[in-house]
Amino acid sequence: MLKAMTLTRHGASLRLSARALAAVLGIAVLAGCGLIGRQGGPQDPRDAVQGSTQARERQWARTAWRYVENNTDGERGLVNGMDRSPTVTVSNMADALAATIAARELGIIEAREFDLRMSRLLGFLGSMDLSEGRLPNKAYHAGTGKMINFEGRPADIGWSAVDIGRLLLWLKIAGQRHSQFQEYADKAVVRWNFCEVIDNCGVLRGSGRAAGGQSFRYQEGRLGYEQLAGAGYAAWGFQARASAELPATEAVNIYGLPVRYDARDARATGVPTPVLTMPFVLMGMELGWDRPGTREMADQVFRIQEERWKRERQVTARTDWQSREAPYVVLDSVFAAGYPWNTLGADGKEYDKLALVSTRAAFGMWALRPGEYADRLIETVQHLYDPDRGWFEGRLEASGAPQTNLTLATNAAVLEALLYKAKGRLYAREDRPGYFQAQTADPFLRLNRCLPNERAACEAAPAAAAAPVAPPGR
């Protein structure tokens, strides 16, 4: 077993481009619920402490919102995925919805601004060009709204099934929490063709372009982000068992504690299987860990990082993050390629010096798991921001230096954590009849887009446990 792990650690099978890796793997009204103090001032010292906490959290939310303000296209409502860079992924669109909803419910923006921002973004989602005429492209230009590749050139580069699942969940949340937008969220989804992105059992398929321009399909998703994406499809009525439920896992002991990881062999698939914090944070805040086994997995991931702090006095909040320099996508892992605390790049190489105390992972664990370690996490990251631009990615473990890159994923996650802390779970398992239901309820009305009412029942065992098919060259 150790030999196999070493091969995984040093072999070339993990070598993916940053963009390919991202594609395959795939983040309360203040006055009423805890961020704005009561009128009339504090009545005793405990109220004074609470008021100070509320003011602090309000400032945190405003700082995160500054990123969105600075990076929004005024015509389409798209928000740059990285500061001052107009590339927008489908996952970024979900982050923009999350950030905007959180800002409104936390009292950071007024109703009119909220309406304008949501209307523009949903208007774009309901009319944007689609990859192969089927589904959202992996990337768009914020300024033009056109499909692009990750170098910023016009191109149809295929879709990410994981990113689409993330967007589906937030479109459903938007319609649930703000019913005036449900019709428009529904209309965006109804126009998509789901025939090749998810099968009848819930296996997710991304698409890409080979060097010669040919389109290809590949099984997409690994433990964590795959389940989060599957929940997005399930929210719209798709049978998503193969992706929403946990795949086959194996366990490794770290400090005598078990940590489960995806059993799919990265050497055979070319796709790494890191254990990361953020997918379990998002599953907790958005879904309440409602799928069997997800709460236990999250507890393992959170607890082992706290244990590292107790034993080694190393504050730890590990997750994936983005850099402006190579390797661009960093898989800062609890466990990966056979080793604990392994930091990998998109090229499969180790980047130990890029190990990070992630701002968004720290905020997420703080919101979900209050306690001494949560307080230490916040103490570590609470000043990692530019008041005019937003929150930084985090603090380097080795030196303590701030990693000053600014991204939508991190700033949206801060807002989402504050909203969760104020109001609890963000997605309710209840469906209000609307446009989507009207279009899919009639068995004689078939749009031929493989919507839930147009599908056969799942008859096979979940295919996610089988060996996935990696895209060529990955």
Functional labels for PLM-detected ranges:
Residues 4-22:
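Bacterial N-terminal signal peptides that target proteins for export
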Residues 1:
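C-terminal, flexible cofactor-proximal segment of oxidoreductases
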Residues 34-474:
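Ser/Thr/Asn(+Pro)-rich, low-complexity disordered segments
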Residues 20-32:
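Bacterial N-terminal signal peptides
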